[in-house]
């Protein structure tokens, strides 16, 4: 079964929350790295951002079930990286949604 490359949120409150979280995310991104199947985003290594990333990942798995999401926490208080990848079409979706 192929999942569509589209947001599937229908509840207005969830959509609004996602917009708020995404705006905060965009403002906090330190660096973006392109990969074959998506992007990785570097974020500040704070407790607040670890919580925000978990929040964002939860919203995205409800909204975009085609996404593969992972967080890398670098050692020695290094940065956090959120990696988003998926099937063909994912990069284009991420470019319009996250970048």
Q: What are these model-derived regions, one by one?
A:
Residues 32-38, 72-76:
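Short, ordered beta-strand-loop transition motifs
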Residues 69-98:
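Short, compact, well-ordered microdomains
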Residues 42-47, 82-86:
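Short beta-strand-to-loop capping motifs
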Residues 29-30, 66-71:
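A short linear hydrophobic-aromatic micro-motif
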Residues 48-54, 89-94:
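Short, conserved charged micro-motifs
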Residues 28-34, 90, 97-99:
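Accessory DNA-engaging acidic/polar modules
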Residues 58-67, 98-99:
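A common structural junction motif
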Residues 6-35:
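An N-terminal amphipathic alpha-helical segment
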């Amino acid at each position: 079964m192929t999942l569509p490359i589209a947001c599937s949120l229908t509840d207005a409150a969830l959509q609004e929350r996602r917009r708020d979280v995404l705006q905060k995310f965009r403002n906090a991104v330190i660096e973006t790295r392109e990969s074959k199947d998506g992007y990785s985003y570097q974020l500040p290594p704070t407790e607040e951002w670890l919580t925000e990333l978990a929040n964002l990942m939860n919203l995205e798995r409800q909204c975009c079930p085609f996404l593969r999401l992972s967080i890398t926490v670098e050692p020695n208080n290094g940065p956090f990286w959120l990696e988003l990848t998926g099937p063909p079409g994912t990069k284009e979706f991420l470019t319009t949604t996250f970048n």
